[in-house]
From Swiss-Prot:
Main location: membrane
Organism: Oryza sativa subsp. japonica
Protein name: UPF0496 protein 4
UniProt biased composition (Polar residues): 371-381
Pfam family, one: ROH1-like
Length: 456
């Protein structure tokens, strides 16, 4: 049946989708429809921006900065929406106020915990900077003394990043509570109230999920991640559910190992720090081994001197014994023979150890020399010292590369932490400002009500 001539055309040619979104015959004006559609389109766009090309990118500080920027934008949008709705606080239901105030105060607590953890990690940069300063050398290669001085700072930094923040652990329960309380509240007799509740449901869902990612990554545990599924009746549901599925699966897989340092930039610095710590510890052990060898050598020399002195005493005793009795001379001779045997065995052992060491060194040089000859086709005498120089050179290059890598990684980590901390602080101020504005309007509304009661 054709439409009657002159009848008004529907704004939606295929029917009004808001009848599905708001069952029960609720009607929205065209202005409210446009406001809600604009808000939810922006929400869906932000969610699509947050979906990384690789799911593991959520473990980076750069993705976390992008996520905080999106949250700040969304919370600014909700404040603008409330203004555009022209819905005074005096018309708000008490339940709406309770929901907003309760969720906002918990969100502020989470922001404080995140800021505290970022500040703690940033303070650890002092230890890294000191270690890098100590390892700096005009010749390029740090000495064993420099490695020894840097080792305690590296160890202390690794202990610092290996500790789980108690505040972040408590955030897990808060996030689960917020996720459990998420629901689209039914609103009667207020089209503006329905739009407001729908918008608040969207922003709370996204905020809780993103914050759970932050807490999970910084704590190195998948437990804080919340399980949410947005119904299809919301225009941004597809973008949210796609992001949730991809990120949750990847984080659960990555964090199941229990590694505390889950942030990629932090892991890069930690890998370099551990390698430098091993090199510094090895250098210290080599120094202690050298000191021990010197002490053993000194002890052997003293034993040899005592043995020689005892031998002289035995000879004197032998002469005296010959002047008295032959029997005493025989006893002393046996003593001399025994002492001489012990001395010979001691010299033999020392000589044997030196010979073994020399044979091993010669064998090693011959083996390396053979390899050099095969590679170069030369029997030059200088080839004999190439293996030793190559080994030393490789160790120096490894050490310098490790220091260079840690310096670059530490600088990237510092900039990343500073930038993320600033963004979290800005987001905190946005949430706090919105909360304060609501409380201020509530006080004004209450005061106006009291004045009206007195006047009447």
């Amino acid at each position: 049946m054709s439409r009657a001539h002159g009848s008004p055309r529907s704004f939606f040619p295929v029917g009004n989708p808001f009848r599905v979104m708001f069952p029960g015959g609720a009607h929205l004006s065209r202005k409210l429809q446009e406001l809600l559609a604009s808000y939810e389109d922006a929400l869906a766009l932000s969610l699509r921006k947050l979906k990384p090309e690789a799911a593991s990118d959520v473990l980076t500080l750069s993705w976390m900065r992008l996520a905080v920027d999106c949250l700040s934008e969304l919370h600014t949008n909700i404040a603008n929406l409330i203004t555009d709705l022209e819905l005074p606080v005096s018309d708000w239901d008490d339940k709406w106020v309770d929901i907003y105030l309760n969720s906002s105060v918990k969100l502020l607590d989470i922001c404080i915990a995140l800021s505290s953890e970022l500040s703690r990690l940033d303070q650890g940069q002092l230890l890294l900077q000191y270690a890098l300063h100590v390892l700096g050398s005009e010749s390029g290669v740090p000495s064993q003394e420099q490695l020894k001085r840097a080792e305690p700072s590296l160890r202390e930094w690794m202990e610092l990043v290996g500790v789980r923040c108690a505040r972040l652990v408590s955030c897990s329960a808060t996030l689960q509570e917020l996720a459990g309380n998420l629901s689209l509240m039914k609103v009667k007799n207020s089209a503006k109230g329905k739009v407001l509740m729908r918008a608040l449901y969207g922003i709370e869902s996204v905020t809780v999920f993103v914050c759970s990612i932050f807490v999970a990554v910084l704590s190195g545990s998948p437990k804080p991640l919340v399980e949410l599924h947005v119904p299809e009746k919301f225009g941004w549901s597809q973008a949210f559910n796609d992001l949730h599925t991809a990120v949750s699966e990847e984080l659960t897989r990555q964090l199941s190992g229990g590694s505390v340092a889950a942030v990629k930039e932090l892991e890069e610095v930690e890998a370099c720090a551990r390698r430098l710590h091993v090199l510094a510890s090895t250098s210290q052990l080599e120094e202690e081994a050298a000191n021990l060898a010197n002490a053993v050598s000194h002890t052997e020399e003293e034993v040899m001197s005592d043995s020689i002195a005892q031998e002289g005493d035995h000879h004197c005793g032998l002469k005296l014994a010959d002047d008295t009795t032959r029997e005493g001379g025989i006893v002393i001779s046996e003593s001399i023979a025994e002492g001489g045997t012990q001395e010979a065995e001691m010299k033999k052992d020392i000589s044997y150890e030196k010979e073994v060491a020399m044979v091993e060194r010669i064998s090693y040089k011959e083996h390396q020399d053979s390899n050099v000859k095969q590679a170069n086709g030369s029997s030059d005498e200088s080839a004999l010292v190439v293996p030793e120089r190559t080994s030393v050179q490789e160790s120096k290059e490894e050490l310098l590369n490790c220091i260079s890598s840690m310096s670059k990684s530490a600088e990237g980590l510092r900039h990343g932490l500073d930038s993320l901390s600033k963004r979290v602080g800005d987001f905190f101020q946005i949430v706090l400002t919105g909360r304060d504005a609501l409380l201020c309007n509530l006080r004004i509304s209450d005061a106006a009500s009291k004045v009206a009661e007195v006047s009447s």
